[in-house]
Amino acid sequence: MKKIILLGGGLQGLSVAESLKSVGYYVTVMTELGTVLKSHFVDKAYKRPITDYEFFLEILRTDVQDLAIPMGDGAAEFLSKNKDLIREKYGTICAVPDYDSMKLVLDKDVFMSFCMQNDIPCPKTISLSVLNIGEAVKRVGFPSLIKPNVSAGSRGITKVCNVEDLNLSIGKILSTYGACTLQEYIDNQEYYYNVMLYRNKNGEIVANTVIKIVRMHPVSAGSSSCCISVVNDELVQICADCLEKLKWVGFADFDVLQRKDNLEYKIIEINPRVPASLRASTISGINFPELIVNDVFNIPQKKYVYTPGKILRYLGIDILWFLQSPKRFTAKPSWFSFFGRNVFYQDIYINDPSTWITWWFVGLKKLFVR
């Protein structure tokens, strides 16, 4: 039985652990998040911050692992930079792309520049500082978004409608998050897409999932609180072309907006690791964690049958969406549809009692760290 260690936790860790456990793998996790540490899907847990890489390497030395999978951007970067050394010294394979590809997507400014240079559809974007406000406004216009180059969960993203707004906001964003960009505002607060793909070393897209995020928190632009798996071949092709130009090998998770005026798609970012909404793939028939293991160890891939139309709710923040959205009683799917054969939860697993209460605390934490 292969031993697989997850570097990090969160809801993505919970989903990955469930998927791996369902096909018989031994799952180890290093995280300080209790929601995963107490999960019935985890065989062995080390309670440690995800950034304690020295302790992680000590785990590999004393408790040999066959494969390491990152649950966060920082963990993905660390494993990508050190994958050759880790394999040589500890015998552990790191399920991450090579760093030459990885470094192009970790920084949002670098990735947007790459997209614009390679005719990949994306919003107009320019690096922003207190010294080039005039040039940035001329290039991008208003309304626009100030976006930190490195952040997660929509943190720090601020909409500005004029120069006064920009001047009032930029100082705080720079001091809190560091370097940032000014990006064209895509006017669509109703939904966005999340596209998950796996590209193997032969350049083949082995599997994909597209989810449409129809409720989010914060309400206008945030993490998914309700999404639906869909079929969208055009989106898959756009994202696959992007991965080809990046020479990407491995799993990738795209955020994509669609303009309301001309219906054009615009790639916003790539997350170089599995997302918190990964369970949307699992309930739709695609086991990405199993697929990753199979590809890494040259195990013949299974034929997955994708079944769209599955609804995944993140109840902890869907409650916050309900409290703040004016569409609480008109939303589709209905906010009050708690049960059904196609309704699942990102934070509650029927087969893991440890999640039956912890979902509430995770949702509250999301509220207070915004």
Regions found by a protein language model. Give the residues of each.
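ATP-binding N-terminal substructure of ATP-dependent carboxylate-amine bond-forming enzymes
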Residues: 1-97, 359, 368-369
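Short acidic-hydrophobic, aromatic-tinged amphipathic segments that line or gate anion-handling sites
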Residues: 45-51, 126-129, 158-161
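A conserved helix-loop-beta module that forms one wall/lid of the active-site cleft
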Residues: 88-156
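Conserved ATP-binding module of the ATP-grasp superfamily
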Residues: 121-123, 143-145, 156-189, 218-221, ...
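Peripheral (often C-terminal) accessory segments that flank ATP-dependent C-N-forming ligase machineries
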Residues: 134-136, 294-370
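ATP-dependent carboxylate/phosphate-activation module, predominantly the ATP-grasp catalytic core
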Residues: 164, 172-173, 184-247, 271-296
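A short glycine-rich, hydrophobically flanked beta-strand micro-motif that places a catalytic Asp/Glu
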Residues: 249-261
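Soluble, non-transmembrane catalytic domains of enzymes that act on hydrophobic metabolites at membranes
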Residues: 260-262, 268-317, 321
